[in-house]
Amino acid sequence: MSEHAPLRALNTFHVEATARWLLSVHTPEALPQALAAPEIADQPLLVLGSGSNVLLAGDPPGCVLCFENRDTAIIAHHADHAIVRAGAGVNWHALVLYSLQQGLSGLENLALIPGTVGACPIQNIGAYGAQVGDFIHVVEAFDRHHQQFVRLDAAACALGYRDSVFKQQPERYLIVAVEFNLPLLCELRLDYAGIREELASMGAELARAADVAQAVINIRQRKLPDPDVLGNAGSFFKNPLLPNEQIAALQASFTDMPVYPGEHAGLGKLSAAWLIEQCGWKGRREGDAGVSPEHALVLVNYGTASGAQLLDFARRIAESVRERYSVILEPEPRIIGAHW
């Protein structure tokens, strides 16, 4: 355990912050004893994987915990699917590649999403028409309220659009591993025209899951900045889900506004990127805080922007969208050290 630990290297925005205590745990079995240390026993706890879905707008209170368990294995084979277990510290993209190498499908649309396996259920990560919740079998976690390890199935995880019980109760559950139910053959999700076009350019009209993954990798590498080069956390805002009546009223005034089906009946989804671009923010930069010129959803740190400066920049983006469209944007990353 380290005291007064710098966190710049542990978040993909590369903002400066300091942890009062930084604790690394390598196995789930070591977790209860580690959490009982007197320095942190009653302190708030922030779990950081790769720090790809947080904005440190200030120093986190209490202790920062890093899980280092990186074991991956197929734990059950069936006729048409397999159960893959991955430790919370496993790199997400590495798991996608592992599943493809084992002849399994389902995760291909989620290739190259930054972060770790332990973080994927929290946000119910999704991209290009797929979300990880469709393939989660069990989440293994330590329940701090009852001081015991628990196994939560997909229903108990309360997975929604960029939401889960882990996001709703961040102080309760510490995810130590995730089990995935992955099919041997899965109907490919090619709803996004960009993926179909990329597959055609690759000469892969009769696509396999590995081809879809490569198409997604190609698209993401073109559109999204590499966080190792330019600080960012991927998409910063959720796509707004609105009642169909409200969307119809908006489309009457803004006829070119794109609309997509929502996850539930009676709801439609707007493109946050389109809203932000229409308000003139795409490519805009103020100091070292800015919006990527390639993708309006991506907030970037060009060098030395603080978390507080990035948060202020994001708030002003959201306020301009609210004023013009009466639509409220919500951030995807968890905001630490400040309120949204």
Swiss-Prot record:
GO molecular function: FAD binding; UDP-N-acetylmuramate dehydrogenase activity
Domain FAD-binding PCMH-type: 14-185
Active site residues according to the UniProt entry: 162, 235, 332
One GO BP: peptidoglycan biosynthetic process
Protein's pathway: Cell wall biogenesis; peptidoglycan biosynthesis
Keyword Oxidoreductase applies: yes
Functional note: Cell wall formation.
Identification of the protein by name: UDP-N-acetylenolpyruvoylglucosamine reductase
Organism: Xanthomonas oryzae pv. oryzae (strain KACC10331 / KXO85)
Gene for this chain: murB
